[in-house]
Amino acid sequence: MRSIIALVLAVLVLVGTVLSIVRARAWWIRIWDFPRVQLAVLAAAALALGWDRWLRGWPWTALGVLLVAALAFQLMLVWRYTPLAPREVQRSRAADDGRRISIMISNVLQTNRQADRLLAVARAADPDIVLCVETDDWWRARLDALATTHPHAVRCALPNTYGMLLYSRLPLEDVREERLVEPDIPSVQARVRLRGGARVWLNCVHPRPPAPGESDESLPRDAELLLVGKRVRDASDPVIVCGDLNDVAWSRTTRLFQKVSRLVDPRKGRGLYSTFHARVPLFRWPLDHVFHSDSFRLVALRRLPYVGSDHFPVFVALSHEPPAAAEQEAPTETSEDLQEARETVQEGRAQGASTG
């Protein structure tokens, strides 16, 4: 019986690993980008269960070798998001509030009705900026309670699970609500004035995921992320990109986004900070992200308590310290990376225009 279970697990791991490598955008292929940790655990379980089989003839030995290779491949992709890896963003030791900015991001789940729970978490975390997605008019009416402490707001409530509400206690300038790729998917850009006077270019996104009932392929999501990455790469102001990206940190698209945008990820060397699925611990991965310029250092990063949604909120506090740019290494792009990003954006916009 152990051998049968080991064989079934091995086949599942190998199929999932191979499909995740395939350069195709179909949702049923791209979905295998997500469960890297789960596939690694299943690979280890299969190796342990079949320990007395792997040297009994070449078919079993070959399967064992492939399983070890799959385990190594999965671990290679996720190890950067463990405390074993070097930190991409240094810890800030500055105590200057004038340089700091804190953000709470929450996918509220549009059908969730525990608004009081979310408001309590937001008040306890006390961020400078609250970004909520999947917000409709019902959520707008409840979350407007934040306006008493966060009077600078951008409201784009929608009934299609892609609404976006932004509340800030810091002044917002040059605010834009755009539909970057698809006509029904908004994003928000604004310049945030820090207490010390510096301006930060904030980009809030929530692209459509590749999933049944959403999109048959990952092109709309990939194009939006890479378009934002291209926009911010040469920005004169420091940049923060945040939101529910509907992608994991280790996917090819997110890694390409990081290289094209030249932004850093504070989770590297610290942990996964998995936010989805809040109610299913065995199937949980990081979908809610914050990327920023290398001129920021990290003050705090934590996952916040459950708010009734299928996502946990996440909180990040950053300190703008320009000398950090010389000490923190942002990812760099190649000409091939830029070409791939350019082609993806062009394809995504063409598809969005044809369907809009």
In which residue ranges do the predicted regions lie?
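Soluble catalytic domains of enzymes that build or remodel membrane lipids, polysaccharides, and related
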Residues: 103, 109-124, 129-356
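Glycine/proline-rich, flexible active-site/cofactor-binding loop segments
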Residues: 49-80, 185-206
